[in-house]
Curated annotation (Swiss-Prot):
GO terms for molecular function: chromatin binding; DNA binding; double-stranded DNA binding; protein heterodimerization activity. The lineage of its organism: Eukaryota, Metazoa, Chordata, Craniata, Vertebrata. Residues 129-142 have a biased composition (Acidic residues). Heterodimer with CENPX, sometimes called MHF; this interaction stabilizes both partners. MHF heterodimers can assemble to form tetrameric structures. MHF also coassemble with CENPT-CENPW heterodimers at centromeres to form the tetrameric CENP-T-W-S-X complex. Forms a discrete complex with FANCM and CENPX, called FANCM-MHF; this interaction, probably mediated by direct binding between CENPS and FANCM, leads to synergistic activation of double-stranded DNA binding and strongly stimulates FANCM-mediated DNA remodeling. DNA-binding component of the Fanconi anemia (FA) core complex. Required for the normal activation of the FA pathway, leading to monoubiquitination of the FANCI-FANCD2 complex in response to DNA damage, cellular resistance to DNA cross-linking drugs, and prevention of chromosomal breakage. In complex with CENPX (MHF heterodimer), crucial cofactor for FANCM in both binding and ATP-dependent remodeling of DNA. Stabilizes FANCM. In complex with CENPX and FANCM (but not other FANC proteins), rapidly recruited to blocked forks and promotes gene conversion at blocked replication forks. Keywords: Cell cycle, Cell division, Centromere, Chromosome, DNA damage, DNA repair, DNA-binding, Kinetochore, Mitosis, Nucleus. The keyword DNA repair applies. Belongs to the TAF9 family. CENP-S/MHF1 subfamily. Gene3D superfamilies: Histone, subunit A (1.10.20.10). One of its GO terms (biological process) is replication fork processing. One of its GO terms (cellular component) is Fanconi anaemia nuclear complex. This is Centromere protein S. It holds the Pfam family CENP-S. It comes from the Eukaryota. It comes from Mus musculus (Mouse).
């Protein structure tokens, strides 16, 4: 019982820090828009945008968890994120492109890792062969 009570303040504190981070980011974005478009935002508007954004992120998190759970997984995958973005075509296209880029980079990284052990094993085989040749020469000399 005491553990649950101890966790609640931590969770509340964590939630408040996340909200503050979202509010700060929204404020920075609003300042950027103000500079580029000469549109001013009141503090109340920034707070409202921050609150809506935070709530939407909570909904996204719950949906992603449900998609993964429905697929009998405990980990959210990029397919879950694509499913979440299915109603926003431009976002879905962007996510798909980035996912493909990451997949290509991963393939290149795996190909390099495969080549590296082969090169290492060749060099170790060559050095062992040289050592054996050297040992054979020493034996024949004695």
């Amino acid at each position: 019982m005491e553990e649950v009570e101890a966790e609640e303040p931590q969770e509340f504190s964590h939630r408040q820090r996340l909200k503050a981070a979202v509010h700060y980011t929204v404020g920075c974005l609003c300042q950027e828009v103000t500079l580029n478009k000469q549109v001013n935002f009141s503090k109340q508007t920034i707070a409202a945008i921050s609150e809506v954004t935070f709530r939407q992120c909570e909904n996204f998190a719950k949906d992603l968890e449900m998609f993964a759970r429905h697929a009998k997984r405990s980990t959210v995958t990029t397919e879950d994120v694509k499913l979440l973005a299915r109603r926003n075509n431009s976002l879905l296209k962007y996510i798909t492109e980035k996912n493909e880029e990451i997949a290509q980079l991963n393939l290149k990284g795996k190909a390099k890792k495969k080549r590296k052990p082969e090169d290492e094993s060749r060099s170790s085989r060559e050095s062992m062969a040289e050592e054996l040749d050297g040992a054979e020469e020493l034996q024949s000399e004695s």
